[in-house]
UniProtKB/Swiss-Prot annotation:
GO molecular function: ATP binding; heat shock protein binding; unfolded protein binding; zinc ion binding
Domain J: 5-69
Repeat (CXXCXGXG motif) residue spans along the chain: 138-145, 155-162, 181-188, 195-202
Domain of life: Bacteria
Main location: cytoplasm
UniProt cross-references to NCBIfam families, sorted A to Z: DnaJ_bact (TIGR02349), PRK10767.1 (NF008035), PRK14280.1 (NF010873)
Residues reported to bind Zn(2+) 1: C138, C141, C195, C198
Gene source species: Exiguobacterium sibiricum (strain DSM 17290 / CCUG 55495 / CIP 109462 / JCM 13490 / 255-15)
GO cellular component assignments: cytoplasm
Cofactor(s) essential for the protein: Zn(2+)
Domain notes: The J domain is necessary and sufficient to stimulate DnaK ATPase activity. Zinc center 1 plays an important role in the autonomous, DnaK-independent chaperone activity of DnaJ. Zinc center 2 is essential for interaction with DnaK and for DnaJ activity.
Subcellular location: Cytoplasm
UniProt remark on cofactor binding: Binds 2 Zn(2+) ions per monomer.
Protein name as it appears in the record: Chaperone protein DnaJ
């Protein structure tokens, strides 16, 4: 079934503030929470609400959703969604709620890593090996936390559920809330003889090397999702995901604007006046560019297809060359003499006609 638009699910405008999104979720969650609404589709509607809120309440996820919708290319096909954590979202507003079985398989935590690359690596794409600290099941006790040859015992207070039930009177009526068992701290089991390697935690921290393929055309701040490269799951659950945020270092010549490249190209007075054919550096290599006579500072030339590749389509943007005319310093006497001679024989009227608007404004400024 095709997913509905998250803004439509919450009944808010696309430019809604964080506070408006929060209010909309609270109102609808009260209506469709399965503990309150006994209709057959209430549970599914509540999951849909919680999924929408989970994305739109997070600035980064909301920005990606606004740009790509449900199919975010940086997610490696995963897109947005998933029902994990919905109980936690409701608990954040209303307290209590239902708890997950502590012995049930749970997905490992997602991780984020920032990788810095050069401008040219962003142009061509690059493969990197990164080292990330992760938590994995202890190899000695295989995640049980118990000393080899022994086994964890089921908590007698909660019967292995990890929580105890407490009845409370609420605005919804009498509701049974589940709270964490204080004896086993939510694990459902008690380790009497802890593993010496992990000291009973069942997990150890280690460094893991991960190979990351960064696609050509990736822009600063974009991220890559590596499914299953996060932390190990709990109780045999799946691994979490790894999100690699790419930072692109600035280039000494080129500036990226979307998929285009902009650069300043210095020209001498003679080149700009008489015209010339010059070599222009691009990320694709050197390109010949004809400079017409009479080129002014601020003139811009376009080199089609010489920009960055689009990370999704592969289509290349353009390169824009901005002309900057360099005024010479430390002239020789002969050069000064020639410039004075040039100035004397120049047609000032012709220059004024070429820049009539500028000269007119200057005269008005002085004469009033």
């Amino acid at each position: 079934m095709e997913k509905r638009d998250y803004y439509e699910v919450l009944g808010v405008a696309r430019d809604a503030s964080a506070a408006e999104i929060k209010r909309a979720y609270r109102k609808l969650a009260r209506t469709y929470h399965p503990d309150v609404n006994k209709e057959a589709d209430a549970d599914q509607k509540f999951k849909e609400l919680s999924e929408a809120y989970e994305v739109l309440s997070d600035d980064n996820q909301r920005a990606r959703y606004d740009q790509f919708g449900h199919q975010d290319p940086s997610q490696g096909g995963g897109g947005f969604g998933g029902a994990e954590g919905f109980g936690d979202i409701f608990d954040m507003f209303f307290g209590g709620g239902r708890r997950q079985d502590p012995n049930a398989p749970r997905k490992g935590q997602d991780l984020q890593y920032v990788e810095e690359i050069d401008f040219m690596e962003a142009f061509s794409g690059v493969e990197k090996v990164i080292t990330i600290p992760v938590e994995e099941d202890c190899g000695t006790c295989h995640g049980s936390g118990a000393k080899p040859g022994t086994h964890p015992e089921t908590c007698k207070r909660c019967g292995g559920s990890g929580h105890i039930n407490v009845e409370q009177n609420t605005m919804f009526g009498r509701v049974v809330n589940q709270t964490t068992c204080s004896t086993c701290h939510g694990r459902g089991q008690i380790v009497k003889e802890p593993c010496e390697t992990c000291r009973g935690a069942g997990r150890v921290r280690k460094n893991k090397d991960v190979r990351v393929k960064i696609p050509a055309g990736i822009d600063n701040g974009q991220q890559i999702r590596l499914a299953g490269k996060g932390e190990a799951g709990v109780n045999g659950g799946p691994f979490g995901d790894l999100y690699v945020v790419v930072r692109v270092r600035e280039h000494e010549l080129f500036e990226r604007v979307d998929d285009h490249i902009v650069m300043d190209m210095p020209l001498t007075f003679a080149q700009a006046t008489l015209g010339d054919e010059i070599e222009v550096p691009t990320v694709h290599g050197k390109v010949s560019l004809k400079i017409p006579a009479g080129t002014q500072t601020g003139s811009r030339f376009r080199l089609r297809g010489k920009g960055m590749p689009n990370v999704r389509s592969g289509h290349h943007g353009d390169q824009y060359v901005n002309v900057v005319i360099i005024t010479p310093k430390n002239l020789t006497d002969r050069q000064k003499e020639l410039l004075r001679e040039f100035n004397e024989i120049s047609d000032e009227k012709g220059v004024e006609e070429q820049h009539e608007g500028v000269f007119s404004r200057i005269k008005t400024f002085f004469t009033g």
